[in-house]
């Protein structure tokens, strides 16, 4: 199977999905290849999950400091299962937002590992096999 595109972007982090959208805005047929989840490292394993958990820790610390500013609260407790659940919900909401952007912009998303074979071909290896992505216009050789 060979699908044809004007632009193939490998990696669906912020740089990747923004490049894909820009390609569409310039009139290109675009494919986006990602081997994990939309959003890249920052969204899924880095900045966003870390900051979501840190926010909970900061609130916990503020609640513990309540008496020093005249605020009386019962001893706060951390429910790590709930903290993880909230983090997962935040990430899922953001991933859905990116997926919606891809759909709205008619960007074809391929989940797998993209390998550039040459200037005009990208191989996408997925669990069920491979897909070939090439140029939309046929190559003319003399």
PLM feature spans:
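Beta1/beta-strand and adjacent pyrophosphate-binding region of the FAD-binding site
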Residues: 2-15
